UniProtKB/Swiss-Prot annotation:
Disulfide bonds: none
Family designation: Belongs to the universal ribosomal protein uL4 family.
One Gene Ontology CC term in the entry: ribonucleoprotein complex
Keywords: Ribonucleoprotein, Ribosomal protein, RNA-binding, rRNA-binding
HAMAP family, sorted: Ribosomal_uL4_B
Assembly information from the UniProt record: Part of the 50S ribosomal subunit. Contacts proteins L15 and L34.
Lineage of origin: Bacteria, Thermotogati, Deinococcota, Deinococci, Deinococcales
Task of the protein: One of the primary rRNA binding proteins, this protein initially binds near the 5'-end of the 23S rRNA. It is important during the early stages of 50S assembly.
Species this chain originates from: Deinococcus radiodurans (strain ATCC 13939 / DSM 20539 / JCM 16871 / CCUG 27074 / LMG 4051 / NBRC 15346 / NCIMB 9279 / VKM B-1422 / R1)
GO BP field: translation
GO molecular function: rRNA binding; structural constituent of ribosome
Protein name in UniProt: Large ribosomal subunit protein uL4
Length: 205
C-alpha cells in the first residue's frame, strides 16, 4: 500500500492505495497504443496508374542501343509512380482494457515514487481567476519550473488554469498514461485518484 498525502481546504489527510510496481514494458505498450490511435494515417502516394503520364512507349524496342523501356510512368523514372508506397489507413488497434487500466495505475505510481504526485481534496480557486490559481500553486510548491498536468472536473479550477503556460488541464475522464508521463508533476483530485485506482484493482482481479 502506498501512503499518499492529500492537501485540502480543511487541512491534509493520508490515503492508502494499492499502487502496482512500475513496469516500463507495460507503460511502453500503452503509450505506443495511444500514439498509434492518434495517427491520422493520411499519407498517400500515386501508383504508376495514377500519375499524369502518357501510356505511349518511349521509343522502339530495337535499334536505338538504349535499354528497353515502356512508358514513363514506371517507378524508375523521375515523376513516375511509387511502388508499394503508403495509402490512407488506420493505425488503430485494440489493447486489452486490463492492460490499459494497469498502465494508468503504473503511470500514477511512477509519479508517486518520484514525489511528483499532488492529490487535492477540492480546489479552493475563487472566481476562476488565473492569478488565484497561480497563488494557490505557489502555496503548494508549484512555481512554474516544471510542466504540470492538472486533472479535475472542477470548472472554476479548469478555467483558472487553462491560461497558465506550464499547466495542461484534463477532465477526470480524459486522464491517460501518455499525458501523465510527458509532464513532470501530476495534480489530481483525490476522489478521482481513488476511482482510477479502484478500477485498475478490479481489472487485475
Amino acid at each position: 500500500m502506498a501512503q499518499i498525502n492529500v492537501i485540502g481546504q480543511n487541512g491534509g489527510r493520508t490515503i492508502e492505495l494499492p499502487l502496482p510496481e512500475v513496469n516500463s514494458g507495460v507503460l511502453h505498450e500503452v503509450v505506443t497504443w495511444q500514439l498509434a490511435s492518434r495517427r491520422r494515417g493520411t499519407a498517400s502516394t500515386r501508383t504508376r496508374a495514377q500519375v499524369s503520364k502518357t501510356g505511349r512507349k518511349m521509343y522502339g524496342q530495337k535499334g536505338t542501343g538504349n535499354a528497353r523501356h515502356g512508358d514513363r510512368s514506371v517507378p524508375t523514372f523521375v515523376g513516375g509512380g511509387v511502388a508499394f508506397g503508403p495509402k490512407p489507413r488506420s493505425y488503430d488497434y485494440t489493447l486489452p482494457r486490463q492492460v490499459r487500466q494497469l498502465g494508468l495505475a503504473m503511470a500514477i505510481a511512477s509519479r508517486q515514487e518520484g514525489g511528483k504526485l499532488v492529490a487535492v481534496d477540492g480546489f479552493d480557486i475563487a472566481d476562476a481567476k488565473t492569478k488565484n490559481f497561480i497563488s494557490w500553486a505557489k502555496q503548494n510548491g508549484l512555481d512554474g519550473t516544471e510542466k504540470v498536468l492538472l486533472v479535475t472536473d472542477d470548472e472554476n479550477t479548469r478555467r483558472a488554469a487553462r491560461n497558465v503556460s506550464w499547466v495542461s488541464v484534463l477532465p477526470v475522464a480524459g486522464v491517460n498514461v501518455y499525458d501523465i508521463l510527458r509532464h513532470d508533476r501530476l495534480v489530481i483530485d483525490a476522489a478521482a485518484l481513488e476511482i482510477v485506482e479502484e478500477e485498475a484493482g478490479e481489472e487485475q482481479q
